[in-house]
Regions:
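Glycine-rich phosphate/diphosphate-binding loop of Rossmann-like nucleotide-binding domains
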Residues: 66-159
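Short, acidic/turn-prone active-site loops that include or flank metal/cofactor-
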Residues: 8-11, 31-33, 111, 130-133, ...
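Generic secondary-structure signature for well-ordered alpha-helical cores
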Residues: 21-25, 60-68, 100-104, 119-126, ...
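Electropositive phosphate-/nucleotide-binding environments in soluble metabolic enzymes
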Residues: 9-13, 46-53, 92, 108, ...
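Flexible, glycine/proline-enriched loop segments at strand-loop-helix junctions
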Residues: 2-6, 38-50, 85, 101-105
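ADP-ribose/adenylate-binding Rossmann-like module
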Residues: 1-30, 163-221
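Generic hydrophobic/aromatic pocket-lining and core-packing "Φ" positions
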Residues: 16, 56, 94-95, 115, ...
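Adenosine-phosphate binding glycine-rich loop
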Residues: 30-73, 198, 204-289
Length: 289
């Protein structure tokens, strides 16, 4: 038996253990390597794009303010100020969508290499002086000093924003806490936080994962499974990712797995009674450091 899909092995080690015991060959789509050849298979990116777009729409829908600038007989209305934290695929899509809606957008990411991408979308990049590029295009965890420096700079931008969208997540680890309770206390009346990192615990200290509620005068929403809210296109994109993964390994109607291929090697979770992904193996066998 072969299983392909999002496995979340760090969340469900017992599931991985069961697949190992039953000698199931499994491939985790979230383990697809970030290399040029595998871009069409990158389901994390395709679903993140859906989530980022939807986050901006949710922020605009729940905000008590217009996003674009309006000039009316009743006077001029200034555009909303939107802050996007995390400039990965989800963050960049949130920036682009908020800009299309007419908002003034600022963005921040610990990976300084994202500055050019942020500015190309018409947003202002916030430079905190902290750079934390990690492996595989992801951000690494910050030191305590880096966290302090980051929060000092971000605090003033957060309190001036009408909407904040957070997308900062580290695969297999809890989401970093970027927005403190004190920052939320100082936010504008009627402002909103959309926390896309809620499934990992959230980027905001007062996020209740899976819930939407008012914290004082600020609306906090930490949704789960955001891509399912745009099910048609999310499914189309995911199906294409799966097709692109399967096409190279199917010959004459049979599955031919080349374990020397980086995509196959890196995305394999279990095979032939073994856990092939080392961090997951360490977690399941109880010797994770």
């Amino acid at each position: 038996t072969i299983v392909i899909g999002f496995m979340s092995p760090h969340k469900y080690p017992e599931r991985v253990k069961l697949m190992r015991e039953r000698r199931i060959t499994s491939f985790a789509m979230e383990l697809i390597p970030r290399i040029s050849r595998a871009q069409g298979m990158d389901a994390l990116s395709s679903q993140a794009a859906v989530a980022g777009y939807k986050a901006a729409i949710m922020a605009a829908d729940r905000s008590g303010r217009f996003f674009p600038m309006l000039t009316t007989a009743a006077g001029t209305i200034r555009p909303a100020k939107v802050l996007v934290i995390g400039a990965g695929v989800a963050g960049l899509q949130a920036i682009a969508t908020a800009r299309r809606l007419g908002a003034v957008v600022e963005a921040y990411d610990v990976r300084s290499a994202t500055r050019e991408q942020v500015e190309s979308l018409g947003a202002k990049y916030i430079d905190t002086g902290v750079a934390a590029e990690g492996e595989g295009g992801y951000a690494r965890e910050l030191t305590e000093e880096e966290k302090r420096k980051q929060l000092e700079v971000l605090a003033s931008h957060i309190t001036r924003s009408d909407a904040v969208i957070t997308t900062a997540a580290i695969p297999g680890k809890p989401s970093p806490k970027i927005i403190s309770t004190e920052m939320v206390d100082n936010m504008k009346v009627g402002s909103i936080i959309i926390d896309l990192a809620a499934e990992g615990g959230g980027n905001c200290e007062v996020t209740r994962p899976g819930e939407e509620y008012d914290y004082g005068s600020v609306r906090i929403y930490g949704p789960f499974n955001v891509p399912s809210m745009l099910a048609v296109h999310a499914s189309d994109m995911y199906a294409k990712n799966l097709l692109n993964f399967l096409t190279p390994v199917i010959e004459e109607g049979e599955l031919k797995l080349d374990w020397e291929d980086q995509v196959i090697h890196d995305s394999a979770l279990t095979h032939d009674g073994e856990i092939r992904h080392e961090p997951t193996r360490a977690l399941v066998e109880g010797d994770a450091s």
